Amino acid sequence: MLSILLENPLLVLFLVAAIGYPLGRIKIRGSSLGVAAVLFVGLAMGSLHPELKLPEIVYVLGLALFVYTIGLSSGPAFVASLKREGIRNNALIIGMLLVAAGLVVGAQRLLGFKGTVTAGLFAGSLTNTPALAGALETIKHIASPELRELLLAEPVVGYSVAYPMGVMGVVLAISLVQKLWNVDYGEEGKRLRLAGTASEALRSMTVRIAWPGAGRHTVAELARHEKWDVIFGRIRRGDSYLLTGPQVRFQPGDLVTAVGTETELRRVAAFLGEVSEEEITVDRSEYDYRRIFVSNPRVAGRQLGELNLFENYGATVTRVRRGDDDFLPHDDMVLELGDRVRVVTHRDHMAEVTAFFGDSYRAVSEVDILTFSLGLALGLLLGIIPIPLPGGITLKLGFAGGPLIVALILGTIGRSGSMVWSLPYSANMTLRQIGLVLFLAGVGTRAGYGFVTTLAKGGGLAIFAAGAVVTCLTALATLWIGHKLMKIPMSILIGMVAGLQTQPAVLGYALEQTGNDLPNIGYASVYPVATISKILIVQILLTMLM
């Protein structure tokens, strides 16, 4: 059997993926390794024979795909995180990552770890695969050819031993702190919703206009003056229907449909009149609605307000669904391939509006090879450019940092002329998963034999203990400083801690604890900065310690 595996690396790749992926979904006390289990299966497979390893191009390709797709989807969130409280939140995260780096260096000095193992310890205790990738890239550039294979295995040892506690330690820290501080997530959620911080599910409501002064202002003027965060749909005026547009004026007695959060809809209804139990959307004889896929490249990457839907088609978009989330469609919202827009328009115009957006499921399942390859090539080129740092240190972003930074920029831009940089949501997630599996399987098999050899020499327990200390102290310090000194609500803060770890398992635990979506706000606001910072820090650590 071993000889068959040695002669068929492609078989090894898919065996590792097929065994590792389901293992990663097994939960123990609410936590699981996720796709990282592929790494451990790869290590086990590679430990069987020194030549049982996948070609280097496998993990390099996987790495490039993984970080590039992350960057494309995180670009807008990254830019948004630099505004308002995002600057404060990201400053805390960067500070804590520097603290973690200091703790790792202290462990290295105290316990005598190699610089390469220390870099893996940093990536594992903070459960960040791109950081491990960045470490491996740096070693490839600075290590001598005869030592390269041996040195490439050492960060994986540190990462693999520290990783499990990198998940469990944070969960334990959150559990301990919320009990000590008697955190009431339900009450905190209510308070934040009143302050307009929380994200609630969207719903529709029928409002009966009773305010006598409604006709003195257009809908756009009212929404701007009262700062309403809702979208108005159709109006029933007597026995006739019309669609709400920016210049439409409500009249007393109108029945109007509105889409928004429960809190905001109640506020609008109290101002304009009262909530009505009538469902005017049931009558679809004149105005109809449907969800339409955005598959037209000429629409993707453009702001919704630029499309002039009401003026050109007499249509209004009341919701945009991206992935599994619904968003209110404001004029400055940039549409992406794969978005599903809910459109209300006259039945006679529905076919025309549908053709305008595209509505082709097949089209949104495909990838624009030109823009995808060009963007990835630009990222790889950036990654090989040496960047001089103070102290004579030269930094290269490598196959991890280069594509990530370029993808963040392109994901924010959305399109350049006729070229759409973003990927359809489904295609992005598929390529991301494939890339991550390729990377983990490749790294695991290539480091497996060295992993076993290193552990056989001793030192595994010391790495595990050091990783546990780094993880727990960093998480506890973040929670204490964030909540006690910076007054960040715990519901958001534990999401930020999950973002600090770039760990979906911790985010899942946080969501279970709060019972609302507030942790998602903290997670999304710091994830891109945390990922980039870890990649840069781990490369600086390696350059200093090797």
From Swiss-Prot:
State the source organism's domain of life.
Answer: Bacteria
Q: Which is one GO molecular function term here? A: monoatomic cation transmembrane transporter activity
Provide the primary localization. Answer: membrane
Q: Which InterPro entries match?
A: AAE_transporter, RCK_C, RCK_C_sf, YidE_YbjL
The record lists the membrane-crossing segments as 4-23, 30-47, 57-79, 91-113, 155-177, 372-394, 399-421, 434-456, 460-482, 489-511, 521-543
Q: Name one GO cellular component term.
A: plasma membrane
Q: Where in the cell is it found?
A: Cell membrane
Query: What does the UniProt keyword field contain?
Result: Cell membrane, Membrane, Repeat, Transmembrane, Transmembrane helix, Transport
**Membrane-topology descriptor:** Multi-pass membrane protein
Q: What S-S linkages are listed for this chain?
A: none
Which biological processes are named by the entry's GO terms? potassium ion transport
Family to which the UniProt record says this protein belongs: Belongs to the AAE transporter (TC 2.A.81) family.
Question: In its UniProt entry, what is this protein called?
Answer: Uncharacterized transporter GSU1016
- Species annotation: Geobacter sulfurreducens (strain ATCC 51573 / DSM 12127 / PCA)
